[in-house]
Amino acid sequence: MERLSSIDAQLRMLVPGKVSEDDKLIEYDALLLDRFLDILQDLHGDDLKEMVQECYEVAAEYETKHDLQKLDELGKMITSLDPGDSIVIAKSFSHMLNLANLAEEVQIAYRRRIKLKKGDFADENSAITESDIEETLKRLVVDLKKSPAEVFDALKSQTVDLVLTAHPTQSVRRSLLQKHSRIRNCLVQLYSKDITPDDKQELDEALQREIQAAFRTDEIRRTQPTPQDEMRAGMSYFHETIWKGVPKFLRRVDTALKNIGINERVPYNAPLIQFSSWMGGDRDGNPRVTPEVTRDVCLLARMMASNLYCSQIEDLMFELSMWRCSDELRMRADELHRSTKKDAKHYIEFWKKVPPNEPYRVILSDVRDKLYNTRERSRELLSSGHSDIPEEATLTTVEQLLEPLELCYRSLCACGDRVIADGSLLDFLRQVSTFGLSLVRLDIRQESDRHTDVLDAITTYLGIGSYREWPEERRQEWLLSELNGKRPLFGPDLPKTEEIADVLDTFHVIAELPADNFGAYIISMATAPSDVLAVELLQRECHVKTPLRVVPLFEKLADLEAAPAALARLFSIDWYRQRINGKQEVMIGYSDSGKDAGRLSAAWQLYKAQEELIKVAKDFGVKLTMFHGRGGTVGRGGGPTHLAILSQPPDTIHGSLRVTVQGEVIEQSFGEEHLSFRTLQRFTAATLEHGMHPPNAPKPEWRTLLDEMAVVATEEYRSIVFQEPRFVEYFRLATPETEYGRMNIGSRPSKRKPSGGIESLRAIPWIFAWTQTRFHLPVWLGFGGAFKHVLQKDIRNLHMLQEMYNEWPFFRVTIDLVEMVFAKGNPGIAALYDKLLVSEELRPLGEKLRANYEETQKLLLQVAGHRDLLEGDPYLKQRLRLRDAYITTLNVCQAYTLKRIRDPDYHVALRPHLSKEIMDPTKAASELVKLNPGSEYAPGLEDTLILTMKGIAAGLQNTG
């Protein structure tokens, strides 16, 4: 126990002053670390364990004293290791950071429970506390004087659609995620009140077993995941938390309504929460997403949905054993009973024919047969492409599944058994309404250019010219005349390139599969009305019976500025207005706009574009839904959910919100039951609050000031990123961007075009690379110049900026997120990368950027009125401090590994290897080196590099 107390003491030194005594984070952290170090000692010997502790201590000293010599000392220790040892060290620190994340998740859930018991607010994520649904409803009724009926009406009609995307940043393998989930559960149980000594011992053993199993699992994906892999990984969250979480959450909403005096439940068909997905539908820049992949993914989702329903319907059959029923149900049950001939031996329960005096079971057994057939048909279609089960024996629409369940519900209520009806049957009805037969609706995303290619091929084939070269007016005129006409445009003899066939086959897949598989058709890089009409025409030509809604996506700064005018032109087309029936969705992209103009200008332009788009829609009497394409990182629009929603412009949400939930954020949102519950709660509560109590509209003088700042910020950002001739070379040298492609994180290439500068780099690797060196350039660059400009112009502007920070949620959130990124950043680390990797003549550029970083941070604190970073959020500050020493060790390890990879003349004297292997103590950890035979670098270097990348990503929690 002595050692545990020494780790404990070391960790306690890092705690900021304002953290309360009942905070359990240090205890959790110390316990997991101690168990891990014991395991490390057992597996690899004392020397290696001591090395890990020494590295940690030197890094912790650097963090407290900021003495740059400590980084050199750490560098010497790490570079003297042999390849096998350096893999073990990198793996150990990466593993310790994953454990720290788990301790934190358990801690957040624990503080939330304490808070609910005490009934007070503990600041969780920021100055503005997130609320649960109950607090929100009470606040709306008590403080904001809304009537309970108004609140109920608003809640019933609102929809939050969470769109899961497989972003290449989910850096943790599923094999590890499952082990992490078990470690989390052990930790929760170990600290529960009523635990016996025997339980404690067994749980502790289980904890050690899971920590060791995770450590012994290869963290690195040795093959790149296919889109089908990504989709299966995304769907695993439905199995594990979302499926059961939704009805549980909706029950909590019922309870919250009861507490404000509404004695009704949320109707089961109220679309409070919906789920969609891009996995296997997003083909923008990902050649691996083919029409076959889309078809597979839809069938797989249908199979999974019917499987989940099958597993639950037997429980429902057990529950509904009543014999009293309505005449309507009795007639249906008798009819079904007469037509059922045989026993069903392939079921475990209720395999004999159900007797007529159990009418509900008769009805449900018929539903079960159809679900079984639906599942088997999807399975057969998936594996061989055809099925002997006729489609009429399966469920093809969600109404077919809802109808018999609704019949049971009505009958129970009519017989005075409403209490029973409101049990599992209501949960089941709510699941069917939420998930349908396809579990999630798949969005299709494609670049507008690809549609232009297809139409160009068609017009050339018809001999009427080149669509690509036509001006917008001519394009619209032709598209509308075709849409109003009846004749087919082209036959099977249309000459097609592979790319064109791919686009058309995608539409054929949409036509072939049931309509409820699909959500929206999103056009990226959309600029003009013809982009939208083109997709409408192609859907018609490929015989899509229920056309998908077409959603333009505006990303680049110039496109965002032009978006309102483009939408107005689209709405003024009569044909289109009739087609959309008063509803339109528009997607706005956060990633590319940030890469194009910097964070400040992008955030402000997104704000203004939304206001104007809503205004255009109002003028035409259209209800507009905004679809927010936010990343997990701040540079790509991430940040705490409730704040992001509450800081949107007034009137822009209006009860309907679509948001992407990406890669690593899926794990943080749905990885565990409590987290999943909190996520659903946050989105629902914040959307309701934004609609019923919109944030203040900014004052005209705030707008003028921000407009002026945005111009300066964009100028400063572009003058460095796009106009500084040495910048691209500096970026490639100072970060691991070139090596990023080797990580096998996602199924899509990291570049849109193989050669070229920053423009062709995807937003994700661009952010990922800067996050790795803890310099976060894309997030803050531009803020400093903007602040400096307005303060030099008139010092009274400082007062106005502070007023904006205190009174305008949007501005506050923008500044708070950048402050959080500064708290995670470390220019000393970035300087180390420069010293080791950047050529002599480029170093002054790095120095100039670091001076800019320091100045921006100073100005930002002045505007926020803070003396220190994060002084308003001691808990976040504590969490960041606890992990700094681990991340620093990984940074030093990464910088020196990059040096060894890139500089063939860089040699160091290696010490004898430290690590012992259990099976054969004479064998070093060099076995690890053989896991990667295809590496083009010296043995062990590539794996060490990848492990440091994954570790730093886990530590900073906002990868790309």
Curated annotation (Swiss-Prot):
HAMAP family xref list: PEPcase_type1
Active site annotation, chain numbering: H167, K595
Cofactor(s) recorded in Swiss-Prot or TrEMBL: Mg(2+)
PANTHER family the UniProt entry points to: PHOSPHOENOLPYRUVATE CARBOXYLASE, PHOSPHOENOLPYRUVATE CARBOXYLASE 2
One MF annotation (Gene Ontology) recorded for this entry: phosphoenolpyruvate carboxylase activity
Pfam families: PEPcase
Biological processes per GO annotation: carbon fixation; photosynthesis; tricarboxylic acid cycle
Full protein name: Phosphoenolpyruvate carboxylase 2
Stored InterPro entries: PEP_COase, PEP_COase_bac/pln-type, PEP_COase_Lys_AS, PEPCASE_His_AS, Pyrv/PenolPyrv_kinase-like_dom
NCBIfam families, per the entry: PRK00009.1
Source species of the chain: Sorghum bicolor (Sorghum)
Catalytic activities: oxaloacetate + phosphate = phosphoenolpyruvate + hydrogencarbonate
Pathway(s): Photosynthesis; C3 acid pathway
Keyword Nucleus: no
Top-tier EC class: lyase
GO cellular component: cytoplasm
The UniProt record lists the keyword Transmembrane: no
UniProt keyword list: Allosteric enzyme, Carbon dioxide fixation, Cytoplasm, Lyase, Magnesium, Photosynthesis
Subcellular localization, as worded in the UniProt entry: Cytoplasm
Similarity section: Belongs to the PEPCase type 1 family.
Subunit annotation: Homotetramer.
The enzyme's E.C. designation: 4.1.1.31
